[in-house]
Amino acid sequence: MARAIMFQGTGSDVGKSVLVAGLCRVARNRGLKVRPFKPQNMSNNAAVSDDGGEIGRAQWLQALACGVPSSVHMNPVLLKPQTDMGSQLIVQGQVRGEARGRYYQELKPQLMAAVMESFAKVGDGADLVLVEGAGSPAEINLRAGDIANMGFATHADVPVVLVGDIDRGGVIASLVGTHTILPQEDRAMVRGFLINKFRGDISLFDDGLAAITRFTGWRSFGVVPWLKAVSRLPAEDSVVLERAVRGDKKALIVAVPMLPRIANFDDLDPLKAEPAVEVVMVPPGSSLPADAGLVVLPGTKSTIADLLALRENGWDRELVAHVKRGGHVLGICGGFQMLGRRISDPAGIEGNVRDIEGLGLLDIETMTEPEKVVRNVEAVSLLHDEPLEGYEIHIGRTSGPDMARPFARIGDHDDGAVSPDGRIMGTYLHGIFSADRFRHHFLRALGVEGGQMNYRESVEEALGELAEGLEASLDIDGLFALA
């Protein structure tokens, strides 16, 4: 078994995913063969791995940081929330059904075998595996059968480092409280802690570090400052969208309704990085900005439920008004399906609503099907005759007159639809704005100069800056010596 270290957090969104990505790049820079691993992830931000299955987008980024192809074994259990009570269960990249509440708790011990099999595969030939936990190990009500945090750590005998987020406040209580509540067996797995997202003079927290060590006996591996490079990396959790605020007005305003089950929202990251573009995330209860030039209906894990939510917020009427003002609309994946006249779900794949009227902005209809399309693709934009690389993750087959004006061509078949006037567009392709030349032509058609930067290079540069920041602020030698 490969040497490994596991990073667990005092809660969700403390920065574990980005820290692991950065440490993967640090290890790679030091000449180590390093691999990422996350036993269980809950996210609708999925990626198509290089071996053709679904994994969390964070593990895809971590594989990039390692300089290796992504694999379904880097995230063997993925939960994609689709209702308030249940999630789609994906095991080693493939859909295995729905996981609901207590049933999933009973299922977890059976999943440990798949987790350990994947862990062995990821570690094969590696010098170091950096493991990311999920949520918090202090949720002792979920400890029985756990595969995400201490259950995995104890089973695989992997040492743990706890991550605390000082930016949200209460980091001393979070770490000391976690120490207090953990059972002795789990507490013994923890070798130390680190503090993330510190703003200001780090020396002012010296007494805080000493206090944490005094209460817990754990050593400190350092304090990570607030690093600007993190903002240029794809985020995994939709909680970051809720914190987005409007900045200075730009040449193009792109409005994005925050659907309850929004998925693959990192499609928007290349647009956010454009100097002339402002992406405005519109929360429930707020109106679409009247000055938006483009509205993007993003991907969603539950198209029908989110279409109902869109109507409840009045965004359907505002979308019609936006179009009448001459605005443009782009629907991606589930957002594309919403733009049509009707969505039918005769098998009840998404729930109890079997048939629903769409927004009617494209003359298309969608029928859901049990078979899920999961693949990386190379395509050509038929709007601008530019190459695209993207990926598909969807259920459903779409047809109708507007499909005669496709958005893109993938091999020997067409994708998406465009309205007769060209202002309403839909596609099943995720990741299209990462293609620089396509983004340049797409924005130019909206009256904005963009696409000058190389987006993929900017992500690589951000990973490099993140690694430099971690090297400067953490005891990397001490951390890696734990494995």
Curated annotation (Swiss-Prot):
The active site is at C333 (nucleophile), H430. Keywords: Cobalamin biosynthesis, Glutamine amidotransferase. Catalyzes amidations at positions B, D, E, and G on adenosylcobyrinic A,C-diamide. NH(2) groups are provided by glutamine, and one molecule of ATP is hydrogenolyzed for each amidation. The keyword Transport does not apply. This is Cobyric acid synthase. Residues 251-438 form the GATase cobBQ-type domain. The gene is cobQ. InterPro entries: Class_I_gatase-like, CobQ/CobB/MinD/ParA_Nub-bd_dom, CobQ_GATase1, CobQ_N, CobQ_synth, GATase_3, P-loop_NTPase. One of its GO terms (biological process) is cobalamin biosynthetic process. Pathway: Cofactor biosynthesis; adenosylcobalamin biosynthesis.
